[in-house]
Amino acid sequence: MNIKSALNRVVNQLDLTTDEMRDVMREIMTGQCTEAQIGAFLMGMRMKSETIDEIVGAVSVMRELASSVELKTLDGVVDIVGTGGDGANIFNVSTASAFVIAAAGCKVAKHGNRAVSGKSGSADLLEAAGVYLNLTPVQVARCIDSVGIGFMFAQSHHTAMKHTAGPRRELGLRTLFNMLGPLTNPAGVRHQIVGVFNQALCRPLAEVLLRLGSKHVLVVHSQDGLDEFSLAAPTFVAELKNGEVTEYWVQPEDLGIKSQSLYGLAVESPAVSLELIRDALGRRKTENGQKAAEMIVLNAGAALYAADHATSLKEGVALAHDALHTGLAREKLEELGAFTAVFKQENEA
């Protein structure tokens, strides 16, 4: 199916099959469509609402066209990522959590990008911390193998996305592509925490990942609107495990953490986010640093559970607490910066 035929279907509120969506996505991602066609298609899909079949088709093409990272094994390798767009401008919780996960002995294949609507994306934060971003897939794999964590810069691995940049920017609205990033990890991880901007997406995206071969995933959205586990409110979870999706709510207290307000956790820039994260990962913490540490432990613990490194969310949080408070997580942040600096010299020589 070509994009013109798809547009006729979509404007009449008719769904596409998975194969039809694959055809259209290949046209879009290989530069065969005009910007007007892409914009119209994305808007039509949003107004109709994307189905699980359509998202599966779109994700499969993006994965197919990505520059993949080949790892020795995917067993227990985890990603923690969010769609963004929650408007809260909280510090980079999932990126900070990744270093705690690695410090707990679990390998992390972190996928991320620069900020679109927020103040600090994962790439912005890591760059501020001295991490070199423009790595080859082989270099990313070496980071994961040696340091326990590697960062896959989305724009380097999904170069076909350049064809959608103009229409997405001009629309200025959330579209299908806001959902695709977290579902298209270039290492093909099967264990994930995926934060989403709308609770209604939790179960559908868990079902998408089930169809695409994921093993253990938690898709989350907090009652106070965050695309991660919140310290201040219950968090809704759609959990994919053992081939089934279950849904439930989690309070911080369920996991041994006291609920508290998010005041003091919003940031205005990557530099401010980094300062708060270094505070949280350090041995001596300010009041806001301690609060940030609790938020990090909550999310890192969930990821350790998703990686099957822990048998329950509560056990995962306990492991994350130990990894953070030993100072090992902060050491991992500095270690990744030093390790990637060697690759920078190689690549720019």
Swiss-Prot record:
GO terms for cellular component: cytosol. Keywords: Amino-acid biosynthesis, Aromatic amino acid biosynthesis, Glycosyltransferase, Magnesium, Metal-binding, Transferase, Tryptophan biosynthesis. GO terms for biological process: L-tryptophan biosynthetic process. This is Anthranilate phosphoribosyltransferase. Homodimer. 5-phospho-alpha-D-ribose 1-diphosphate binds at residues 82, 85-86, 92-95, 110-118, 122. Belongs to the anthranilate phosphoribosyltransferase family. Pfam families: Glycos_trans_3N, Glycos_transf_3. PANTHER family: ANTHRANILATE PHOSPHORIBOSYLTRANSFERASE. The gene is trpD. Catalyzes the transfer of the phosphoribosyl group of 5-phosphorylribose-1-pyrophosphate (PRPP) to anthranilate to yield N-(5'-phosphoribosyl)-anthranilate (PRA). It comes from Pseudomonas savastanoi pv. phaseolicola (strain 1448A / Race 6). It catalyses: N-(5-phospho-beta-D-ribosyl)anthranilate + diphosphate = 5-phospho-alpha-D-ribose 1-diphosphate + anthranilate. Binds 2 magnesium ions per monomer. The keyword Transmembrane helix does not apply. Mg(2+) 2 binds at residues 227-228. Mg(2+) 1 binds at residues 94, 228. Anthranilate 1 binds at residues 82, 113. Pathway: Amino-acid biosynthesis; L-tryptophan biosynthesis; L-tryptophan from chorismate: step 2/5. NCBIfam families: trpD. Transmembrane segments: none annotated. Anthranilate 2 binds at residue 168. It is an enzyme of class 2 (transferase). InterPro entries: Anthranilate_Pribosyl_Tfrase (IPR005940), Glycosyl_Trfase_fam3 (IPR000312), Glycosyl_Trfase_fam3_N_dom (IPR017459), Glycosyl_Trfase_fam3_N_dom_sf (IPR036320), Nuc_phospho_transferase (IPR035902). Its cofactor is Mg(2+). Its EC number is 2.4.2.18. One of its GO terms (molecular function) is anthranilate phosphoribosyltransferase activity.
